[in-house]
């Protein structure tokens, strides 16, 4: 009986992932860098660079957004990988 119960516990842990969420660096233009826990379903981090002709701007966060022309986007799926 104990081996069956142990097997059920292990299967539950593996299948449910026990609430694991992605942690990404977050930064809006002209704001300090922080970390954020991504919402459920978002398993990627992004780093977006663009220029407005006077300076280079950087934005970081959760997800992998669609980009506009003349932007550089890097997406990754490891905690805090978007440095």
From Swiss-Prot:
A GO cellular component annotation in the UniProt record: extracellular region
GO molecular function: acetylcholine receptor inhibitor activity; ion channel regulator activity; toxin activity
Keyword annotations: Acetylcholine receptor inhibiting toxin, Disulfide bond, Ion channel impairing toxin, Neurotoxin, Postsynaptic neurotoxin, Secreted, Signal, Toxin
Disulfide bonds: 24-45, 38-62, 64-75, 76-81
SUPFAM superfamilies: Snake toxin-like (SSF57302)
Protein localization: Secreted
Organs and tissues of expression: Expressed by the venom gland.
CDD domains: TFP_snake_toxin
Job description of the protein: Binds to muscle nicotinic acetylcholine receptor (nAChR) and inhibit acetylcholine from binding to the receptor, thereby impairing neuromuscular transmission.
Name recorded for this polypeptide: Weak toxin DE-1 homolog 1
Source organism of the structure: Ophiophagus hannah
Record bears the keyword Magnesium: no
Signal peptide stretch: 1-21
Superkingdom, taxonomy of origin: Eukaryota
InterPro entries in UniProt: Snake_3FTx, Snake_toxin-like_sf, Snake_toxin_con_site, Toxin_cobra-type
Similarity field: Belongs to the three-finger toxin family. Short-chain subfamily. Type I alpha-neurotoxin sub-subfamily.
């Amino acid at each position: 009986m104990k081996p069956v119960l142990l097997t059920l516990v292990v299967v539950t842990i593996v299948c449910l992932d026990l609430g694991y969420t992605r942690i990404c660096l977050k930064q809006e233009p002209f704001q300090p860098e922080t970390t954020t826990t991504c919402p459920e379903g978002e398993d990627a981090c992004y780093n977006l660079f663009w220029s407005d002709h006077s300076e280079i701007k950087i934005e970081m966060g959760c997800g992998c957004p669609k980009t506009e022309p003349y932007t550089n986007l890097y997406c990754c799926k490891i905690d805090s990988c978007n440095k």
